[in-house]
Amino acid sequence: MPTVREATYDLFRKQGMTTMFGNPGSTELPMLQDYPDDFEYVLGLQEAAVVGMADGFAQVTGKPVLVNLHTAPGLGNAMGAIFNAQANHSPVVITVGQQARSMITMQSNLTNRDAIRVPHPYVKFAYEPARAEDVPLALAHAIHLASLPPCGPVMVSLPMDDWDVEIDAAAAQLVIDRQVSGRAGADPVQVTELAARIRDAKNPIAVAGPDIDAAGAWDEMISLSELQNLGVWAAPATGGGRLGFPESHPHWRGVLPPAVGPVGETLKDHDLVLVVGSSVFAYYPNIPGPFLAEGTSLVQITSDPDEAARAPMGDAIVADVKLTLTALLAELEQTEREAPPAWPGPSRVEETDPVNASLILSILAEQIPEDAV
């Protein structure tokens, strides 16, 4: 019969999750005992950096990635980075060591009290399995949920004495062999109606959000902008680090001001606002004003049902962003609308003494590979 440890690593292997980022302590060492030769462990010295590396790794690979943290202190240190991973829609699967089961009730040293509550509200799922035998299924649950739209971080608390427990091989294999797919396209009727609204608009504009990048839909968003001569703003204050449209493109307009009044003022000359891959909107600070000018309508495309439900105005299509844009492009032809004025691109940052951060980032941007995160 396999142990919990053996079944768990078989599960990770089946899901292609053979790179683990972590900063372990004593409660995590039993999990790492007999660490498989085909796995890599990327050690960090602070938990926020560890989760940040995993977040970037998930963005590059498009797959769920493992993070290994040390009970309550490690999870607490990582919370800011977990917030960013949530904003980036990154499928980060966090395992957190827990005290031995016989010691939890006494709240012995290193017990993670209320472990499930600690990471909320910045994870999609937090769980501590009731039995050692449930560990592989709990981890599979977390992995699949992290990977379903909208992707995001999850956490499983794992007691340190679970790993050598033997479990039923057949039941474990059923869990290991499962595959879950969650990409769903938009209702074709809604896509056709949206295409007609874009076609009929006199002066439409687009707002690009981070879910475009998360869905791998940059090319589709660029094609839509060029096919319909849409200027493209970046959604304001989304958190995280993803961009939905290249800042070097001539249709780029910049980043929307994040407050209610300024957003409405910025978009007032447009009769249709198409928001793709973003909430509507992450407003801040509190500068009142009309959400939209009279005569301006808004349509949102998002994979996140909560983003769609909480928007204060406009219509919403909840579906995979890439699939929806692909279907929308098939409904549209090259517009005769005039192209927006070309964006000249960012100006060169002047050298200062002391040196400023913008100059450093500009120099780094010129040197790093194009596929760097």
Predicted regions mapped to residue ranges:
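Anionic-ligand anchoring segments at beta-strand to alpha-helix junctions in alpha/beta enzyme folds, i.e.
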Residues: 18-55, 97, 186-187, 195-273, ...
